[in-house]
C-alpha cells in the first residue's frame, strides 16, 4: 500500500511544482506590466503638469502616427487624464490577478501539506 501513496504524493508534488513555476512566470509578467503602466501614468502626469502652465487659449499638436493634429489645450488635458485613469484601472486589475495567483499557489501547497499530515496519521 505504500507504493500507491508514494505515487499519489509524487504526482501531487509534480503538479504543484508545475503550478508554482507557471504562477511565478505570470507574477513576473504582471510585475513588468505594472511597472510599465506606472511609467505611462507618470509620463502622462508630468506632461499634463507642463501643459497646465501654458495659457488656456494655446493650441497644441498631438502626434498621431507620422502626422500631427492641431488640438486645444483642454482636449490634450482630457486625453492625458483619461490615460492616467485607464492606467490606474489596469494596475488595480493586475494587482488583483497577482494576489489571486499567489493565493492559489498557497492553497495548493496547503492541500499537499494536509495530504502529507493525513498520510502520516494513518
Swiss-Prot record:
The modification N-acetylalanine is found at residue 2. The keyword Chaperone applies. The keyword Hydrolase does not apply. It holds the Pfam family Prefoldin_2. GO terms for biological process: protein folding. SUPFAM superfamilies: Prefoldin. One of its GO terms (cellular component) is prefoldin complex. InterPro entries: PFD_beta-like, Prefoldin. GO terms for molecular function: protein folding chaperone; unfolded protein binding. Keywords: Acetylation, Chaperone. Signal peptide: none annotated. Heterohexamer of two PFD-alpha type and four PFD-beta type subunits. Binds specifically to cytosolic chaperonin (c-CPN) and transfers target proteins to it. Binds to nascent polypeptide chain and promotes folding in an environment in which there are many competing pathways for nonnative proteins. Belongs to the prefoldin subunit beta family. This is Prefoldin subunit 1. It comes from Bos taurus. The gene is PFDN1.
